[in-house]
């Protein structure tokens, strides 16, 4: 230790816990809002931080403490010495043989948010695939919002109340110890409502403009701003415009084939796109496509 001093008990030097108190006080002040860390740090590390801050500043260092639980890998504790570990960039690149398939940063983030931060989380290939599929479902529903038909004067009041109830519930869930898993479950309920009304536009009752606006804000606010999920597939800028334009040309060719009753060509285009993780859906109001990975 470079910092040493003589005391009446023995040679003194800074303890292992003091650096955290020193850094937080310097950069965040005597008291800040949220202190994070793993559950294994509750004792002795965080208890020592509290004791140090009371001694030096006369107050608690943080208003709230968030202790995350362990992240398992295929049901086992991560251990570099046992070869059971994986790095974030290895997940994104698919360069680790434990989980050899690559996953987007948003899919990995969504996977983690589906569990409460104080729950044990098991990182597996199947769980990541399920999260990937779930994220695609929410993104697809968000994309359909702009295509929903408004039936003025014939709105389903019960559904409108359900939408508002789910939104109110999301505020309650996030206020209750950041319960992201319940919030995401409610977003799936809203996605189901969007799909029902998109696939059945001729129903006697429908959504009014206010409800569609509420749905839009719910996805933007909770999934986008709070949970930090990009609401479109993981392509940006010119790449996105290029993909949209290319798909428009391909689907026009497929539409021509169907118009000429050339079913083999139509099916071939759909199947080839499916192998590239692009899903084509034929609906009452036309054809839609989405990236399922």
Q: What spans do the regions from the language model cover?
A:
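Alpha-helical recognition segments enriched in aromatics with Gly/Pro capping
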Residues: 1-146
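Structural preference for alpha-helix termini/caps and helix-kink/transition segments
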Residues: 86-293
């Amino acid at each position: 230790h470079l910092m040493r001093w003589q005391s009446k008990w023995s040679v003194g030097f800074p303890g292992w816990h003091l650096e955290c108190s020193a850094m937080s006080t310097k950069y965040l002040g005597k008291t800040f809002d949220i202190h994070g860390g793993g559950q294994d740090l509750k004792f002795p590390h965080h208890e020592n931080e509290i004791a140090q801050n009371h001694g030096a500043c006369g107050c608690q260092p943080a208003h709230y403490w968030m202790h995350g639980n362990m992240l398992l890998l295929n049901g086992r504790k991560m251990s570099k010495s046992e070869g059971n570990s994986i790095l974030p960039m290895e997940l994104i690149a698919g360069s680790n043989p434990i989980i050899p398939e690559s996953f987007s940063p948003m899919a990995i983030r969504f996977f983690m948010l589906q569990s409460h931060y104080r729950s044990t989380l098991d990182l597996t290939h199947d769980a990541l695939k399920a999260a990937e599929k779930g994220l695609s479902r929410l993104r697809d529903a968000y994309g359909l919002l702009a295509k929903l038909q408004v039936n003025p004067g014939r709105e389903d009041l019960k559904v409108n109340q359900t939408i508002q109830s789910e939104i109110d519930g999301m505020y309650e869930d996030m206020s209750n110890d950041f319960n992201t898993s319940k919030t995401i479950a409610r977003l799936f309920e809203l996605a189901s409502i969007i799909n029902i009304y998109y696939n059945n536009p001729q129903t006697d009752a429908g959504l009014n403009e206010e409800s569609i606006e509420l749905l839009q804000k719910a996805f933007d606010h909770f999934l986008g701003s709070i949970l930090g999920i990009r609401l479109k597939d993981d392509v940006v800028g010119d790449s996105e415009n290029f993909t949209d334009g290319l798909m428009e040309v391909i689907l026009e060719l497929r539409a021509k084939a169907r118009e000429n009753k050339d079913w083999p060509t139509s099916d071939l285009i759909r199947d080839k796109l499916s192998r590239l993780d692009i899903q084509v859906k034929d609906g009452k109001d036309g054809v839609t496509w989405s990236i399922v990975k």
